[in-house]
Amino acid sequence: MEKFEGYSEKHKSRQQYFVYPLLFQEYIYAFAHDYGLNDSEPVEIVSYNNKKFSSLLVKRLIIRMYQQNFGINSVNHPNQDRLLDYKIGFYSEFYSQILSEGFAIVVEIPFSLRELPCPKQKEIPKFQNLRSIHSIFPFLEDKFLHLDYLSHIEIPYPIHLEILVQLLQYRIQDVPSLHLLRFFLNYYSNWNSFITSMKSFFLFKKENKRLFRFLYNSYVSEYEFFLLFLRKQSSCLPLASSGTFLERIHFSRKMEHFGIMYPGFFRKTLWFFMDPLMHYARYQGKAIFASKGTLFFNKKWKWYLIHLWQYFFSFWTQPRRIHLNQLANSCFDFMGYLSSVPKSPLLVRNQMLENSFLIDTRMQKLDTIVPVTALIGYLSKAQFCTGSGHPISKPIWTDLSDWDILDRFGRICRNLFHYHSGSSKKQTLYRLKYILRLSCARTLARKHKSTVRTFMQRLGSAFLEEFFTEEELVFSLMFTKTTLFSFRGSHSERIWYFDIIRINDLVKPLN
């Protein structure tokens, strides 16, 4: 406990950041507006009669949120209240969105100040490739072959947004900002029901995505801080990523309360993390925890994590949200891939002088497969094919120019191949490529009121070049006299690209 208190004091900041006055600075909302325009996932900014932004209107909005009858009016007469606000000019979707983005920017300031890199860590930028999503798969290929069990975890969600606000109190001691956050969240009466679904938690409303992402990340860093402390105290292996987790103020008090409720429980569970062969990875609202040991060992850890969420964070969770399976006999969904570690037979011939021996061995290998059925279902929902995978035209794009249509289909195909380049079976990707290519041809043929065969003959090789992937382009430069399609089986090896920093849009609905 003394070590923990020292660790907590080391990472705890005693400075109090008063961020509330920044909400009335106009440049903050200019940053929020620029973020919406320059973000990699664009946010649609709702226009407001082409009027210029004014911090005075934001101030009026904040004052109105503090009125006592604000919550009652918005619940009893939501449509009438919204229409009245729109007419008088100081409440609209535009200013609600700007206030949400502005508050998210302001409240992130204390955390960015705590995470400023020290001069000794100037070497870190050379490891920028580790930011890539694909960088984790070579790690899994190296480590998972020696593990026994895998737990697939669905991270529990708070039953009420007030819990997220209370978690922020340990880091932000600016009371007016927290009160404003409560009033702002209470306005959206549908947010409480909106947050009760883990799937919907990540399909944020576009105009409030940054604020929700901040609230969720602050919650996740809380329980990961607990796991980080146990890991650092029980293993001699240093963690290079320890700086990414944020501290929790007054954590030792909660630890003492936890020890009173479960005397001796904390001391007994320390050995859970003594084994260095334990690996944790989180993505979106899920996490995987792989370890080496017995079934009893992993079941105890499962119940330990459930008690941690229920009694430590007041988050209700159920045992079925943690699926424990033997790694060699299970398949898990991770980052858009269906991964498994099967044992493949390998026949090795060993010859010694005049005698020859055949040795039958079984080797383990991380197998990553593209969930083709789910991707075809998504393409069907996007009207590129039928539910059975039969390509169809996309009428909504027939108003575009021919090259715009080719560019859109080609970009989707290249992005799909780029993200799923690590697949063990590339045949499924070529099936998706066939669907997109024929759907593009039918869309162009429908636009020009001709047949697919006639249109393909008119475009010739220019049509096929739009669907070339990076691997095929490399092979076309190496072997210019050979057609690209003859190399389909020769470049079946998995390729991980280190320039992918976010999940493909086609993968998001699958998680």
Swiss-Prot record:
Family statement drawn from the similarity comment of this UniProt entry: Belongs to the intron maturase 2 family. MatK subfamily.
Keywords, alphabetical: Chloroplast, mRNA processing, Plastid, RNA-binding, tRNA processing
Underlying gene: matK
GO cellular component: chloroplast
Protein known as: Maturase K
Keyword Ribonucleoprotein: no
Organism: Phleum pratense
Xref: PANTHER family: MATURASE K
Superkingdom of origin: Eukaryota
Coiled-coil positions: none
